[in-house]
Amino acid sequence: MDDLKTSEAWRIFRIQAELIDGIETLNDLGPAVSIFGGARFGEESPYYAAARETAALFCRQNLAVITGGGPGIMEAASRGCFEAGGTSVGLNINLPREQHPNHYQNRSLTFRYFFIRKVMFVKYAKAFVIMPGGYGTLDEFTEAINLISTERIPKFPVILVGSEYWKGMSKWQGCWHRLPQ
């Protein structure tokens, strides 16, 4: 039992190391936009095309683009930024399946802990673009809205892409008219 307590206590150093590595890697990034979206959208998806084009537009305005670094929407946004000559940041996560870093990243970090990864998304972004996705996208979206609504971070644009996709959430939540302006 003492070994378990000791190993758990040492976990704090791994958490601290991930946080320091993220800050050191991104500290000179400059203004950026975080684009969130699902891993399962392929190149044939209109959402893939929209993410690619949106990221390219941001990069042409000298904004870096931060994504989850994986496939699907994350790849599309990274690719659009990379092809536009911008800085594409991938915040990858160790998962048992699905998540593999895409090839369109100028800066890449891999995290074990979701909460440290989310700190990096929030700390360096001036806006969030939320594309269709799954539980991870929903988690990132609600984290951002919660931090803004509780005034833990300054208010900034949170853009939902795909009104039809988000309609059910909007109806369930009933709060879009109350989102921080």
Model-derived features with residue positions:
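Active-site/ligand-binding-proximal alpha/beta "capping" segment
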Residues: 112-164
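Short glycine-rich anion-binding loops that position phosphate/pyrophosphate groups of nucleotides
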Residues: 38-41, 94-96, 133-137
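Alpha-helical elements of the RecA-like P-loop NTPase motor core of helicases
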Residues: 75, 139, 167
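Short amphipathic alpha-helical segments
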Residues: 78-79, 102, 140-143, 171-173
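Short, solvent-exposed amphipathic alpha-helical segments in soluble enzyme
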Residues: 82, 143-148, 174-178
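Acidic/glycine-enriched connector segments
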Residues: 72-130
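Amphipathic, Lys/Arg-enriched alpha-helical "gate/interface" segment within cytosolic domains
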Residues: 26, 32, 94-105, 115-118, ...
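Glycine-rich beta-alpha loop segments
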Residues: 2-91
